[in-house]
Amino acid sequence: GVCCGVSFCYPC
């Protein structure tokens, strides 16, 4: 999967 976000990671 791909991570989105700056200060934390969440699935796109």
From Swiss-Prot:
Family, similarity comment: Belongs to the conotoxin T superfamily.
Entry keyword set: Disulfide bond, Hydroxylation, Neurotoxin, Secreted, Toxin
Cellular component, GO, one term: extracellular region
Cysteine-cysteine disulfides: 3-12, 4-9
Species of the source: Conus araneosus
Protein name: Chi-conotoxin-like Ar1248
Entry comment, domain topic: The cysteine framework is X (CC-CX[hydroxyPro]C).
Function comment: Inhibits the neuronal noradrenaline transporter (NET/SLC6A2).
Keyword hit for Ribosomal protein: no
Tissue: Expressed by the venom duct.
Subcellular location(s) per record: Secreted
Gene Ontology molecular function, alphabetical: toxin activity
Residues carrying 4-hydroxyproline: 11
